[in-house]
Amino acid sequence: MTIAPEGRRLLRVEARNSETPIETKPRWIRNQVKNGPEYQDMKERVAGASLHTVCQEAGCPNIHECWESREATFLIGGANCSRRCDFCMINSARPEPLDRGEPLRVAESVREMQLNYSTITGVTRDDLDDEGAWLYSEVVRKIHELNPHTGVENLVPDFSGKKDLLQEVFESRPEVFAHNVETVPRIFKRIRPAFRYERSLDVIRQARDFGLVTKSNLILGMGETKEEITEALQDLHDAGCDIITITQYLRPGPLFHPIERWVKPEEFLEHADAAKEMGFAAVMSGPLVRSSYRAGRLYAQAMEFRGEEIPAHLAHLKDTSGGSTAQEASTLLERYGASEDTPVVSFN
């Protein structure tokens, strides 16, 4: 393969990736779909108002569970990203002009969907002087303005580590400030060439110093070792990360990084236990966990761990903090049993 679907020539890394066939998923990478009344209501609202969410457009396997809790994720900044990560399906190309009306439209969508909790994520905008800091901040401000009973999580790029840009985002005061490290130092440059591991840790450190609840994510199965995962977890905790999600890499297509291994639920449980032992305020670990999965629940758990009262206008989120969730490793083990009999596939 030498030509991408959109007609351009493949990057060398894409050509190399395409030499490895798409991998077959193990038995524990499956989802149980349950359509509850809140999900059905959300679906009708989204269709009726022609709203757009990452949940639908990315085909997220957790949409039924998250929508049942009235949580949803929105992608801002356009369809093109100014950087390329080897695991990410978002198109890397020159971004579209900034749409200054987007924050209000997103806030109106949150209101129409009657969300309890919203996650905002988006593309990197190195083409803009402020790298998108105003956009990420304004979306939070507009959601809070129109939806005082909705929690907001802001999952942002690194803004090249520029303190003034980060400060602008901090001052919008999302309930959770999230920046995903995604992988371990040894393979970081190969997976995320336009980012820097230490810079990402510093972004989290600055947010924690500002007083925000902080969050990050690790994707497993891209070539890291168990020991490196533990070290990365410790790095994140030392940087002041409150909430950690841990997930399995699922390859979006042949042009993306091959899956190095399928991580078994037992190992996800080990990493969750290690993270809790380190002192993370909230942990979610499992193959189909995503960084925005049950985000309101994790925020409530983190606030309780920190000894802080959830604001009265968000008190309803307390009701989501207990019990197990469908995608946690412990739940998968109860559902499918031990996976030792299923071989770990390596594509090295």
UniProtKB/Swiss-Prot annotation:
CDD domains for this protein: Radical_SAM
Cofactor: [4Fe-4S] cluster
Keywords (A to Z) from UniProt: 4Fe-4S, Cytoplasm, Iron, Iron-sulfur, Metal-binding, S-adenosyl-L-methionine, Transferase
Entry's Gene Ontology molecular function annotations: 4 iron, 4 sulfur cluster binding; lipoate synthase activity; metal ion binding
Pathway where it operates: Protein modification; protein lipoylation via endogenous pathway; protein N(6)-(lipoyl)lysine from octanoyl-[acyl-carrier-protein]: step 2/2
Subcellular location: Cytoplasm
Family matches, as Pfam families: Radical_SAM (PF04055)
S-S bridge residues: none
UniProt signal peptide: none
Domain (Radical SAM core): residue spans on this chain: 67-281
Stated family: Belongs to the radical SAM superfamily. Lipoyl synthase family.
Entry protein name: Lipoyl synthase
Organism: Corynebacterium glutamicum (strain ATCC 13032 / DSM 20300 / JCM 1318 / BCRC 11384 / CCUG 27702 / LMG 3730 / NBRC 12168 / NCIMB 10025 / NRRL B-2784 / 534)
